[in-house]
Amino acid sequence: MLFNSVLRQPQLGVLRNGWSSHYPLQSLLSGYQCNCNDEHTSYGETGVPVPPFGCTFCTAPSMEHILAVANEEGFVRLYNTESQTSKKTCFKEWMAHWNAVFDLAWVPGELKLVTAAGDQTAKFWDVRAGELMGTCKGHQCSLKSVAFPKFQKAVFSTGGRDGNIMIWDTRCNKKDGFYRQVNQISGAHNTADKQTPSKPKKKQNSKGLAPAVDSQQSVTVVLFQDENTLVSAGAVDGIIKVWDLRKNYTAYRQEPIASKSFLYPGTSTRKLGYSSLVLDSTGSTLFANCTDDNIYMFNMTGLKTSPVAVFNGHQNSTFYVKSSLSPDDQFLISGSSDEAAYIWKVSMPWHPPTVLLGHSQEVTSVCWCPSDFTKIATCSDDNTLKIWRLNRGLEEKPGDKHSIVGWTSQKKKEVKACPVTVPSSQSTPAKAPRAKSSPSISSPSSAACTPSCAGDLPLPSSTPTFSVKTTPATTRSSVSRRGSISSVSPKPLSSFKMSLRNWVTRTPSSSPPVTPPASETKISSPRKALIPVSQKSSQADACSESRNRVKRRLDSSCLESVKQKCVKSCNCVTELDGQAESLRLDLCCLSGTQEVLSQDSEGPTKSSKTEGAGTSISEPPSPVSPYASEGCGPLPLPLRPCGEGSEMVGKENSSPENKNWLLAIAAKRKAENSSPRSPSSQTPSSRRQSGKTSPGPVTITPSSMRKICTYFRRKTQDDFCSPEHSTEL
């Protein structure tokens, strides 16, 4: 009693305005211990040890040392905690129920208590007289919790596994020998996310009728904040609800609506519940023991519904773990599933708790003596009850060390690692990592048959810019392909030039060429890779012509006269293709050839002389076909591109001026022989041909070949004259 008076002094204990004390009571927590005389085993009807489920200290004046304990067999025992002799400690016991008693509560200020059991009833007991004062009947399942208001002696509340909360009043008359509920909250903690809408409830009488059963939404704990306010928690919805008892919840058919709700503040995705609720002495702070191993502290007076503090370090895996506050509201104690009890300082929730060790099974119900800070009671599934006392530091006897069955320990602070980026090898990545390029893994690179020029295939994002090692054969083939592709002139330019060239060289009487255009002809030549790319468009045209065709210049003015051209005056071009040549045989010079052949029979001597003269002239070498050549050098010197160092005359296919001196002499002689002739001596065909002569000299390329008709000259009247006449001329 001296210690209690010291704690109540303002300078040492709780201050008048509230929380902290000048005296460091935190250091006293390590002095709690349990002697073997304070350890009590809970027995059943047959003397078999059974686990105790609930314990609570009396609130009657000068009777605060009385401890009531209920066990699984329905027995209630009263312990005098002032006596440390085991024989005198338990002074009274009786069998309150034929089933397990899950909770019990003292009537405020009196030696009376109410027990809530698994037989679906609550019983009202007079402890001093040892009499049953009444039975409360109305639940359809086990009762899990019972609570009294702070200043009410006749009204109490119970919550059961049927999901209902019932309010009882012992002042009401009994019917059939049982007390009936005066108020009821049905389905207090039903989940709101139902797949189908609930059926409308029928209006029920608030007294004596059986309520609906909802065992899946069990009410685990009820607690009074004041005379008109009730706080409750469920097993699976994770919501703490505050109810106003002045409202009649049975008068409506819809679901009951709480005046205030505290949603589950944790991070678990599983539906969790609360096993215990504790209010401080002022009723403004609520401590909720959740099955996610946390105790949440809520402010009941404000509008904020999130917790103001969280206590952790213990384990809570069942709904039998309870909590309690010290008489000065400075410390919070809770049972735990790891065979220990934990004590936290309320003002320092981050501080490691003090651990009470000594039990061998889960610690369920705990209670701090409301009038004595130095006394704590704990129940465990090891079938024992331990009363913890503060070591006063008196002289210890030699046998006291061996009689200690409970001791304290300071829990070490767990250092939580800061959030650090975990390497990808230790964590599952969000996406598959990109494979690193290596000589052995070359799947992103192109195959050997794929064109290797830039722009054919885009590089994948995971493919490095450097080339992957390949075999020498593959390297050589790729180099040759690159060389051949780079040496070819641009396709659009060559196709355009060839189409323009075909259009220019075509005449109204000529037919389109049989061979496909150069843009569609895809015949590769070995010489392609060896010919350098021309810088001018004319050079590209010449190279394109040399690859695709070997052309001949059909010149009509070979031996007759420099001014004489083709009979049709078209400067046509034929190919070295048999089919094309046969098709073009009658295009332009058919009439002229027939005339020459007809005249050839009249003058065989002169024509033979002319033919001999024509054949004696050295003809320029014909261009070498790129298909027949196997060399790797450039084209022969006589084959020069068109337009290089010369001027284009007449047609687009004209060649630069490169006259042969023998042909020049022959042409000069022909001019001298034909100059004295009179206009009357000329035939109409000759006059027609002379009128169609070109104004300038016609250039002959060394690489072009003469037409067959140019080897024969048309005979005139002068050719049939006598030799004397020709000598005179």
Curated annotation (Swiss-Prot):
Residue windows of the WD repeats: 47-89, 96-135, 138-178, 214-253, 269-308, 313-354, 358-398
Keyword Ubl conjugation part of the UniProt annotation: yes
UniProt feature coiled coil, ranges: none
GO cellular component: centrosome; chromosome; Cul4A-RING E3 ubiquitin ligase complex; Cul4B-RING E3 ubiquitin ligase complex; cytosol; nuclear membrane; nucleolus; nucleoplasm
Key words, A-Z: Acetylation, Biological rhythms, Chromosome, Cytoplasm, Cytoskeleton, DNA damage, DNA replication, Membrane, Nucleus, Phosphoprotein, Repeat, Ubl conjugation, Ubl conjugation pathway, WD repeat
Chain segments carrying region Disordered: 189-212, 416-445, 460-491, 504-546, 596-705
UniProt biased composition (Low complexity): 427-445, 476-491, 630-645, 674-688
Motif (DDB1-binding motif): 168-171, 243-246
Pathway(s) the chain acts in: Protein modification; protein ubiquitination
Residues bearing PTM N-acetylmethionine: 1
Subcellular location as annotated: Nucleus; Nucleus membrane; Cytoplasm, Cytoskeleton, Microtubule organizing center, Centrosome; Chromosome
Residues bearing the modification Phosphoserine: 409, 425, 484, 489, 494, 511, 556, 675, 678
Disruption phenotype: Early embryonic lethality due to cell cycle progression failure, termination of cell division, and, eventually, embryonic death during the preimplantation stage.
InterPro entries: WD-repeat_CDT2_adapter, WD40/YVTN_repeat-like_dom_sf, WD40_repeat_CS, WD40_repeat_dom_sf, WD40_rpt
Modification Phosphothreonine, positions: 196, 463, 515, 683, 701
SMART domains in UniProt: WD40
Job of this protein: Substrate-specific adapter of a DCX (DDB1-CUL4-X-box) E3 ubiquitin-protein ligase complex required for cell cycle control, DNA damage response and translesion DNA synthesis. The DCX(DTL) complex, also named CRL4(CDT2) complex, mediates the polyubiquitination and subsequent degradation of CDT1, CDKN1A/p21(CIP1), FBH1, KMT5A and SDE2. CDT1 degradation in response to DNA damage is necessary to ensure proper cell cycle regulation of DNA replication. CDKN1A/p21(CIP1) degradation during S phase or following UV irradiation is essential to control replication licensing.
Assembly and oligomerization: Component of the DCX(DTL) E3 ubiquitin ligase complex (also called CRL4(CDT2)), at least composed of CUL4 (CUL4A or CUL4B), DDB1, DTL/CDT2 and RBX1. Interacts with CDKN1A and DDB1. Interacts with FBXO11; SCF(FBXWO11) controls DTL stability but DCX(DTL) does not control FBXO11 stability. Interacts with CRY1.
PANTHER family per record: DENTICLELESS PROTEIN HOMOLOG (PTHR22852:SF0), LETHAL 2 DENTICLELESS PROTEIN RETINOIC ACID-REGULATED NUCLEAR MATRIX-ASSOCIATED PROTEIN (PTHR22852)
Descriptive protein name: Denticleless protein homolog
